[in-house]
C-alpha cells in the first residue's frame, strides 16, 4: 500500500506540474514560473510529505517529488512525440545519475565526519590534550 500511495502522490504532482507550469511561465514570464512554484509545489509538498502520501523511512534513501515529476515529464514527451524523446534524454539522465551518486558519496562523507566530531565532543578528553593527540594515544593503546 505504501508503494501505491507514493505512486499516486508522484503521479498527481507530475501531472499538475507538466500541465500547469509551462502555460504559466509562457503567459506571465518569470513571474509565472514563481507563481507556478508557489501554487503547485507548495500544495503538492504538503499533500505528499506532510499528509504522508510519500513516506520516507529514516534508514532509507530519501526520494522526493522531483523524481516523480521528472519521470512524468519524460514519459509525457514519449507518449506525445514518440520513443525518440526517451533516447534523446538518456545522456541527461545518465549525467543526473552520476551527479546523484557523487552527491551520495559526498553526503555520506560529510555525515561520517559530523558523527565523528559529535562522538569526540561526547567523550571527555584529558585537560590540555586535543582530539588528535587523544586519537593517537588510543591508536597506540597507550591509554
UniProtKB/Swiss-Prot annotation:
Annotated membrane topology: Multi-pass membrane protein
InterPro entries: DUF6905
Span list, region Disordered: 118-143
UniProtKB keywords: Glycerol metabolism, Membrane, Transmembrane, Transmembrane helix, Transport
Chief site of localization: membrane
Induction conditions: Repressed by GolR.
Intracellular or extracellular location(s): Membrane
Function recorded in the entry: Could be involved in the glycerol uptake either via facilitated diffusion or active transport.
Name by which UniProt lists this protein: Putative glycerol transporter Lin0368
Amino acid at each position: 500500500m505504501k508503494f501505491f500511495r507514493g505512486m499516486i502522490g508522484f503521479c498527481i504532482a507530475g501531472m499538475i506540474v507538466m500541465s500547469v507550469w509551462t502555460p504559466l511561465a509562457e503567459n506571465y514570464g518569470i513571474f509565472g514560473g514563481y507563481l507556478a512554484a508557489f501554487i503547485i509545489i507548495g500544495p503538492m509538498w504538503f499533500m505528499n510529505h506532510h499528509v504522508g502520501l510519500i513516506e520516507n523511512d529514516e534508514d532509507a534513501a530519501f526520494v522526493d517529488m522531483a523524481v516523480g515529476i521528472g519521470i512524468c515529464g519524460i514519459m509525457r514527451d514519449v507518449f506525445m512525440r514518440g520513443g525518440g524523446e526517451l533516447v534523446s534524454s538518456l545522456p541527461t539522465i545518465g549525467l543526473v545519475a552520476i551527479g546523484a551518486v557523487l552527491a551520495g558519496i559526498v553526503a555520506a562523507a560529510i555525515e561520517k565526519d559530523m558523527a565523528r566530531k559529535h562522538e569526540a565532543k561526547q567523550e571527555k578528553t584529558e585537560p590540555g590534550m586535543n582530539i588528535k593527540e587523544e586519537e593517537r594515544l588510543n591508536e597506540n593503546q597507550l591509554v
